[in-house]
Curated annotation (Swiss-Prot):
One of its GO terms (biological process) is proteolysis. The record marks 318 as: Transition state stabilizer. InterPro entries: Fxna-like_M28_dom, M28_fam, Peptidase_M28, PFF1_C, PFF1_TM. Its main location: membrane. May be involved in vacuolar sorting and osmoregulation. CDD domains: M28_Fxna_like. Residues 1-16, 412-442, 495-508, 555-659, 715-721 are cytoplasmic. The active site is at residue 220. This is Vacuolar membrane protease.
Amino acid sequence: MASLRLPRANPLAFTRWPVTVITAIVYLALLIPLLVVHHVVPSAPSSPPSGLNISEAWADLQVLTNGFHPYNSRRNDVIHSWLLRRINEILDSTPLEQEYRALDEEKPDVFVFDDVYSNLTTYGGTLKDADLGVYFEGTNVIVYIRGWEDDTEHWWEAPNGVPTSRGGVLVNSHYDSVSTGFGATDDGVGVVTCLQLVKYFTTPGHAPRRGLVVLFNNGEEDFLNGARVYSQHPISKLPHTFLNLEGAGAGGRATLFRSSDFEVTGPYMRSPHPFGSVLSANGFDTGLIASQTDYVIFQGNMGLRGLDVAFMEPRARYHTNQDDTRHTSKDSVWHMLSAAVATTEGLVSDSTDRFDGAPNTDGGVPSGSGSQAVWFDLFGSTFVLFQLHTLFALLVTLLIVGPLTLLFTSIALTKADKMYLFRSSAKSEDRLDVVPLQGLRGFFRFPFLFGIPTVVTVGLAYLVTKVNPYIIHSSAYAVWSMMVAAWVFLAWFVSRVADFARPSAFHRIYTLTWMYVLSWVSAVIATVYANQRGLAGGYFIFFFHAGIFLATWISYLELFALPSKTEYANQLRSVSGRASGHGSRRGTTSGEDDGEEAEEEPTESTSLLGSGQRTTFANYVRVGGDNHAVAEEEVIDPNVYGREQAWSYALPKWTWGLQLLLTAPITLIMVGPLALLTISAISQTGQDGGHPLFAYVAIAIFTTIMLTPLLPFIHRYTYHVPLFLLAVFLGTLIYNLVAFPFSDSNRLKLYYVQEVDLDTGVNSATFAGLSPFVKDVSQELPSAAGQTVSCEWHTKRRNLLSCSWEGIAPQPVEGDHPMKDWGALKGNVVCLWSDHNQPGVLPALDEAIQFLPVWAAVTKGSDGLVEGRRAFEIGNDD
């Protein structure tokens, strides 16, 4: 058997080793930085800007988090007093007036409001429970730094007073924690950031143009009460824009969760390390993210325009005792602080009227309205921001221009007689000879090439969900590795089988054409959602579609390098004539399509010119003579790869690299961060009752999108990488099916509450969590020994099992028996206890924390850790 030896001088040729090495380098060169950006927080500077002190902020965070401080606790009152003292210390340390005047500015007036008077009653539709009503008395701390364009009067002291200056800026954080968490990230970092903002904007050189209101609200963890009651304070009429600082994880980077519009998002571009995507905002808009922050009060109820910046992972530490300073860092503090300073400085220095206008909610502030925005970061260092209607215009343009460009190119190819696509044969100039082109070969590969790996990865999602549904909680990258390895190996295997059975030089162009059609349909869907529902999360589809269009167009332009079909037919007839030696025509064939239809099984001597001539593996042309006399002439062209069509010698050998660079990098850069952000956000939501299948299917979808750019080139891969990935797949599959899903660094949260019926004396401690783990943990507690642990499905937390046993009686406090006369009334009085700072007060909870396995954590299951309940009935006085 003769072997084909292609020239090795060109390291960019479309051959196996260049394709394997270059594609691997491109993917690794992008995936590694994306992973680093996602997991590594930029270092805090050794010398921060004037007016900021990171060491001071870290010391404040340590004080703030040295105990649980929910709204309903003594520790919360201690933090309230400490905040007032720290604010006064910062203000007392400001320099004299002369230092401000040296910088051509006035020292700003600062007003501190210890708001223990505002109160609010909310009920019905404003809360999650339509049957619930809440009366709340606030203990917010408000700092107002007067802008040098603000009114100089104390307008807030006048009855119904309103500011006459342009709207100010609100920066919000909450200083209460949950009863089971120290609140370092939720929301201690936000609180110390606000303290540093007070310091920064009272430092010479940073006096604000617009008034700045810094709010330390108390009561966010219970119905967002702190933000609600802030709306009752007169100073709430001043701000038109806001920045909300929040935490839903422990450490890491602070991401831009959402923003109200294009104009208010602009100042965030000043952040030295921007991070986030508008896709997360769409998650809130569509209801996929059910939890809320104070953002919804400021933007939805009060009509302000602003941004929501928050920490978002890992969720396993959220609202637990691992939300402490040990599990965050100064770098995380700096990441939020630097973003807050940049954004706030941009908002308070704005000199336009774009944040003033008609209220956009009933009774809201006159903040006007803005344009819908598209925004995302690039490698955590650059922030891209443009308006949604710009995305719509770009999508519509590309949807029209792309098909027309390919159509006109196809027409030009047809006129030049170089349209080999979909052509099974060609005729010579005298139209007497018909030679096969095999131009349809490879067209029907893509549905199998794309479909089989995708279906298998989705099937793996269902398999893991069935066998070990929560392994993603602690081993998300094992799931990623399994999906990626399976997808690449199957795509390579299918492509190699197809290439062996039907070798085709058109594999690349047909695959890109199919990809273009799919991306075009996706772009249509993204356009419809952007126009009708204002959802901008499909922005990545535009870039994905644009790259595929250009790569596809390049493949069509490559066809101009081919000889015309007539010229090619003449060349083959000339070769056939010389080989026969007697001028007879050889190898004439019908014009029937031989692309994907049944034909002679290809072997080393499969016919090149149909039934008359045969070619060896090395592209020999063998011409048979009459009466078994054989005359043979060898025609070898090293520019033809393998057993592909002979006319492919003229195709460029380097353009594949350009096509790879147009498809793979842009896909990874656009989709990679979304994949990491999305899976980080949802991989641990199963413990909250979310269905785990969603996370696995999401990984399968992201895997398919990010690896699809490999399909036009994967048939050129050597076997080394796919076989290695096959081994990775088998190993990770076994691990994902049998490994225990939780660990001490990725614990399972169990929701705890203790209920005491003061009439009957029934004392019930309850854990709610995933089955069967919650039952196993409950039965192992000493107080549950010898008892029958009662388990039933939770009525409010879907997919969670609630297990109860007779707990150790709480010893919160001794009290008296106040009496009051009412009219006819009956119901239940419920008292809550949330303070768990003193051992022995809640012995059942102390026991649970002490004896829980290392892979489980306690979090609050209700507003109180203990709920004391007593029925009452008061008759009529008469």
